[in-house]
Amino acid sequence: MDIHQNKILSQCHTLMLDMDGTILDLAYDSFIWLDLVPKEYAKKLSINLDEATVILKEHFVSLKGSLKWYCLDHWSELLGIDILLLHEKERSRIGYLLGAQEFLEVVKQSDIRVLLVSNSHRDILKLKIEETGLDQYFDGIHLSHDFKAPKESRLFWTRLSSIEEFDLSKTIFIDDTPKVLRAAKEFGIHSIFQIIDPDSNQPRSIEIKYPGISGVIDLI
């Protein structure tokens, strides 16, 4: 495909992509956090699964959107579980969303600068790179932990812009989380898209706040 003939991408100088739920299937992460962690926590505390789930939900609600929410070290310490080990044991579940790798192959052949912009913990990023080789498609990789601020905050975008030069009017950002997209929009990024099918094992997202696409492949 000639990307210069694409109405959306032909005007793009910088393409920023989220990882989980945008490039990679969120089903892996959902399985870890909604299935495996509750079972391990119930086993550790010698309580039933429902009780463990209630306790975990309280933790999740209190931290969602904060940097601690995305910090493996914090969760391992809080729960007394080796969260990274759980991820490693299930690494075979890691995979691209439908059409995502094809999309990356196309934009790799273009003049667009492609950046991975993620809230992921670095150890999880490393694991996912080992399984998918996704790093080969990006000109730069930026994690919220490096900026000490989650993507949901303006501070993240301010700090990102201090080390990455990009024209707000010619930048596209794609993510599956409305609060992250809102922060990017408020910072001034002109074109944003919300992935509405981030998890292959779950129904389509009902919280659609921005122009929605099933997957990144829809842009080509």
Task: Label the model's feature ranges.
Residues M1-L15, E105, H121-R122, K126-I220:
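Asp-based, Mg2+/Mn2+-dependent phosphohydrolase catalytic module
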Residues I47, I81, I112, F166, ...:
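Short glycine/serine/threonine/alanine-rich loop segments
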Residues G99-D111:
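Catalytic-core regions built around general acid/base machinery
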